[in-house]
Every structure is written in structure tokens, then in C-alpha cells.
Amino acid sequence: MAVTESIASSGFPLGFKFRQGSSRPAVITGAGHGCFVAEARHFSAHHQKEAIVTEGEHGSSWRMTSDEGLHIKGDNLAPFPLGFFNAGLQADLAQRIRGLAQARGMTLSSLTLSCVTGYSMTGSFFQGNGVGAAEPAVIHVYGEGPVHAQAFFALVNEAVAASPALASMTQPLANTFALYLNGQRRGVTILPASTAPSAPDPLKTYSAPPAPLPGSERDLIVKTGITREGPIQIATPAAQPGAPIVRHVEGHCVTDLASGDSVTKICLQLPGMSEFALRTSTNGKDRAPSGLALLSAGVVFCYMTQLSRYIDYMKL
């Protein structure tokens, strides 16, 4: 009898450190360059997914899980993909603010952020005429300490300019694609083809499901138990033909300025949606993933959700 694998069946936390690295890339804490690799797979349980995100050439690898809410027939066991993106934006910006404040000798006693990211789609994804769009992120930064408002404003602006996460929303990217079937690379005809060497076959790279390192943190991703008021409403097409379907994600980030850890709570702004908390870290102790790692996971999870929805529709 076939075994149905799911997020719950492993018994593992929703997020954990999978592989210990020797050093984090410089881009996590300041200026520099780093290549983040996100490898994801789809569970047999509908929208459930897991990803391994490796932070740079010598950084640690983190396993994260994602699911969708009941409104699109998910199981609501783990954060939704767009929530990872929202949390990654805030966590990366918070780290830049903290780091620059320390470098400038500015004392902050507290640092919190809030962020709303919006997305819309017109047309039909399944009919091939869907057009997606992202709204500008609305971010509020709150700081306390013996710092003049003008100096704090300048500090935040400098952090915004230094954030690779926020740059992903302001600078156009030329995306390329590669396709593999049964371990063999196939030609890409419609989308821009990647010129990079072939990626390793994940079925050969991972002989067993990822498991937590001994002693690793178990609260990197948790479901808080808080839900938005109102009954869950199953997603339906737009009421008017051609009208956009709009979704907003709300997040709140609190940073421990002493440790460098941040906790970001995210929720989709729809009735009945669940809140999740994601922890990040930027200090040398490497206790939790970086904001850039969350951002990377969010991108690959979004792709997998749309791919699985298309597979369902086409009955493949």
C-alpha cells in the first residue's frame, strides 16, 4: 500500500536546521555577494511542500515547510508562500537597521516593523490569459531610543538602500529557466533558458527526507493559534469579468536588538486565516535562517503552488 507523505507524517518541526555550514555569506549582514539555493518538493498531500534553503557556498541549510489555507483547499498546517516573502522583507530590513545603528554608534532600545504586501490577478490562470501583479510593499518602522527623529529617518533610508530583499521589488530581474524530466535536462522553448550548468538530481542528492540536526532549534516556524475573525470563504472567480482578485498579507516583526533574532508574525487578510510566526537570526551563532533565506523559500513555494494548481486543473 502506498504511503501518503505529509508535513505531519514526519513528526518534525515546521522548520529546522538541516545542515551546518562553516560561515554565513557576507550579504546577510552587510555588503557582499551570496548565492542562495532553494530546493523544494511537493508532498502527496495537495498544497503541502518543503524546501531546503542553503545560505551561500559555505552557509547552513534550513528546511522549511509551506501549505495553503482552507480557502484554496489546503490543510493550513504551515505558512503560505506569500507569507514567507513578507516575513523575509521585514527580517532583512530589520537586520540592516540594527547593523547600521551599531556601526553608527546609535542606541536603540526597541525596533519593530509592520508590512503589508499586496498581490492581484486578472484573467484566468487556467485559460492561459492570467496576469499577475504585485503592489508596492507598505512598511512602517518603529524605533525607540535616545536618537533624533531625523537621524533615525536617515538610518532607515540607508538600510532600505542596503537591503537585497527590498531590491528584489525595485530592480527588474531577468529570470531564466531549466526543465528536467526523469533526471534529464529538457529544452525550454517559451521561457528564457538558463545557461547555468545542470542542477544535481535531487533524487540522488537526498537519499532520505531531511531531519533536524541534533540540538537544533524547534521553534523557527510555529502556528500561533490565532485566527482572523469570520468564517473561511472558499476562493471563487472575480465577481465581474476582468476584475482583479486581490490578496493582502499582513506581517509584524519584532527584533531583539541584543541577540539579533527577529520574530515575524504573518497572516493573510481574509476571514478565518491562521497566523504563523517565523524566527530569523543574523548573529554568528547561526540559530535561525536569515530574512533572505525566508525570501528565497517564498519564491520557490509560490512557483510550486501554481504548478500544482495547474496539474490539478489539467488532471495530469
Can you say where each PLM-predicted feature lies in the sequence?
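Alpha-helical metal-binding/catalytic segments enriched in His/Glu/Asp
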Residues: L89-L93, C302-Y303
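Extended beta-strand/beta-hairpin segments
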Residues: A2-A87, R98-A297, M304-L316
